[in-house]
């Protein structure tokens, strides 16, 4: 029997707000443990939460950027469960009246066909504290860091539209791009600002039944999500084929063993309305005000890059996948760099050098103005491509302009015809055998002679002009 998977994702995204969701404590989970706390996020008796306006606005922009419909009224509930990371015994979430419904992301499936992956709803909630497990002597202990307690989150709950690991990975890549564009979050699984749980079940291909699902956690990268989903599909298919029942429970992904392992029985605590946080009522005027703050989104930007700059669809999508890269590209265009030159050197040279140094494009010392000055020297044949790559590396380590670096290193390209003709005449006189080979029909001899001219010029000669002048002289010899 052939099986297909039914997959839904639950994605928690930490909003990059300065304070927590219901208090004024700094939203800096990485600080020294338990310094960013107050009676509200520790939930002392009598502490009254106050919803952060900044968090509401960031969450609303995120929802609108994903095509979701902000609801006129949403509310917080108490999601009840007992665990050391939640001292009050419940988490403030939006179980019944979420902030937004609908929306979705368009991807391309494994066969190159467009596919819409829908979002069921998006809600806000507070994060829980962080548990740190250590060994003291021979005794295992668990410590609790409340810096993260109360951090502002949104949870995106998808429809079960996913069928393959590819679907899940492409959805997450596109989601990450969309969220970064609206400026709501860094959205990094590696840094914990995006956390993903996958709900997976299998069924006979061609049927529409919904079978028992298994939740998978502990996936710390998009690649891990793909690997975990693939493993779980295989595991459940084998279970069903052998007549074994799939039991509702939660499993952990182990990236070292590339397998999932049972964690606990699946438990959903009761949710009851919270009386301490007022309803969130959004007027049509407020929603339109938020919509007006949306930036140009990736798909629209890619379309504009194709229409305005003549890029291919693939090039435009690649550039617009990251807002910093897209903005840097347009800054080069504003500096009068040709679009194709800007695209090629940005994607093949600068980004590679930035990654090699562990930097971010926004923080690199190679500003668009400095990089553009280098590329314009290349376009004017003042330097060759090899020299441009050398100068680019130096731009990371010094504050000099490309022009001064070129002068200091003496690598300005020689394009003067008279000077180059003198070099060519000398090389032809010193290499009569190669000249005879060329006249005898061996075209590769021209490449040898060009190399000799480049060597004689110390690598400074313009190779395009050398080829043109050398070929003309050789052909004139008959």
UniProtKB/Swiss-Prot annotation:
It comes from the Bacteria. Allows the formation of correctly charged Asn-tRNA(Asn) or Gln-tRNA(Gln) through the transamidation of misacylated Asp-tRNA(Asn) or Glu-tRNA(Gln) in organisms which lack either or both of asparaginyl-tRNA or glutaminyl-tRNA synthetases. The reaction takes place in the presence of glutamine and ATP through an activated phospho-Asp-tRNA(Asn) or phospho-Glu-tRNA(Gln). This is Aspartyl/glutamyl-tRNA(Asn/Gln) amidotransferase subunit B 1. It catalyses: L-glutamyl-tRNA(Gln) + L-glutamine + ATP + H2O = L-glutaminyl-tRNA(Gln) + L-glutamate + ADP + phosphate + H(+); L-aspartyl-tRNA(Asn) + L-glutamine + ATP + H2O = L-asparaginyl-tRNA(Asn) + L-glutamate + ADP + phosphate + 2 H(+). It comes from Syntrophus aciditrophicus (strain SB). GO terms for molecular function: asparaginyl-tRNA synthase (glutamine-hydrolyzing) activity; ATP binding; glutaminyl-tRNA synthase (glutamine-hydrolyzing) activity. Belongs to the GatB/GatE family. GatB subfamily. Disulfide bonds: none annotated. Keywords: ATP-binding, Ligase, Nucleotide-binding, Protein biosynthesis. HAMAP family: GatB (MF_00121). Its EC number is 6.3.5.-. The keyword Ion transport does not apply. Heterotrimer of A, B and C subunits. One of its GO terms (biological process) is glutaminyl-tRNAGln biosynthesis via transamidation.
